């Protein structure tokens, strides 16, 4: 009896998690080297780097579940002159998949930003990002009858009809927009601090108008992407330690609102310009009455190349703070970044020494 009750509770909870994963919330890129560009179209070209980025994010749950995300992007930052106010151009590819039933979502997107320099120390960029989403389920991965699937819960005998419905391959055209800015100001000991801030909106287009599906409006309503609002604020304070060791301490706050899902993440990163960064963060996820906490640890390594080229390697580990719940998953993300050109910073240099 006790086992049956636990099974019912597990099925109910996992179905709740599925509804969050597949309908209510987008996959988040967790590493500082990538989260700005994948979370705000206006950040395209803002850091002045032209290069290529690849990454993978994998989640391990309390039940046997393998949820993976793959990220690829290319960034190009325009020079200050003869660009008609353009900031940068970025291309994105993202693939989310749950391997036990092969639920796949693919994203193809391009972001273009325009720059407005309000003063010597303040610059703003606005950006647009048209996107294509492709969603599908592999029906051969589903087993009918009394199967307890780790992602979908219990698969019932009525699944043939549901399987033919969800196996529909859906293609979505969507649009995102954002604004990103930075204000620099002088502080003591010949350094420059900066305040960065951004706001973005994803899934602007009405979903029932953006889907191209064999099953028409019914499939569109079932597979809708809820509008997502994201905000980001960070403060970077320079610390020159001598011997040309320049470090920056950056506390940050990120907020995401998507349908009934709320995310609040805050933390701090300590970066050395030549070597890399280390960071620590805490994220709270809220879905109606459900609240989940996650601890994030960030590591980054800079590998200099030529004069204006080099490599970056990023790693993030996410560990749940609420152990013992069904919603516990440890995620690992690894990313590699290669840049071949550095455009001069939009504002003044951070260190004078």
What kind of feature is each model-predicted range?
Residues 25-353:
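Subset of outer-membrane beta-barrel
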Residues 1-26, 341-353:
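Cleavable N-terminal export/targeting peptides
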């Amino acid at each position: 009896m006790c086992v049956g009750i636990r099974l019912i509770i597990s099925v109910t909870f996992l179905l709740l998690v599925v509804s969050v994963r597949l309908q209510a919330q987008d996959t988040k890129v967790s590493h500082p080297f990538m989260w700005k560009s994948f979370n705000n179209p206006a950040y395209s070209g803002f850091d002045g780097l032209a290069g290529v980025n690849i990454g993978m994010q994998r989640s391990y749950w309390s039940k046997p579940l393998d949820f993976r995300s793959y990220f690829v992007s290319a960034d190009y930052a325009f020079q200050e002159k003869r660009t008609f106010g353009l900031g940068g151009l970025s291309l994105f590819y993202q693939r989310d998949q749950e391997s036990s039933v092969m639920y796949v979502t693919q994203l193809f997107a391009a972001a273009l930003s325009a720059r407005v320099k309000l003063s010597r120390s303040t610059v703003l960029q606005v950006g647009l990002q048209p996107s294509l989403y492709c969603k599908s389920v592999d029906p051969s991965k589903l087993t009918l009858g009394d199967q307890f699937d780790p992602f979908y819960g219990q698969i019932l005998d009525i699944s043939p009809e549901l399987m033919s419905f969800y196996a529909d391959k859906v293609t979505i055209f969507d649009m995102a927009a954002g604004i990103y800015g930075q204000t620099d100001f002088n502080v003591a000991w010949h350094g420059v601090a900066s305040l960065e801030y951004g706001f973005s909106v994803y899934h602007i287009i009405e979903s029932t108008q953006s889907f191209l599906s064999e099953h028409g409006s019914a499939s569109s309503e079932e597979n809708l992407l809820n509008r997502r609002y994201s905000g980001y604020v960070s403060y970077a304070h320079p610390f020159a330690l001598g011997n040309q060791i320049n470090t920056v301490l950056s506390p940050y706050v990120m907020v995401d609102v998507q349908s009934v899902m709320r995310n609040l993440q805050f933390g701090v990163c300590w970066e050395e310009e030549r070597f890399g960064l280390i960071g620590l963060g805490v994220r709270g996820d809220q879905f109606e009455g459900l609240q989940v906490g996650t601890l994030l640890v960030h590591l980054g390594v800079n590998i200099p190349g030529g004069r204006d080229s080099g490599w970056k390697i990023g790693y993030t580990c996410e560990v749940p703070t609420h152990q013992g719940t069904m919603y516990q998953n440890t995620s690992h993300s690894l990313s590699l970044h290669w840049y071949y050109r550095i455009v001069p910073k939009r504002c003044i240099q951070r260190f004078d020494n």
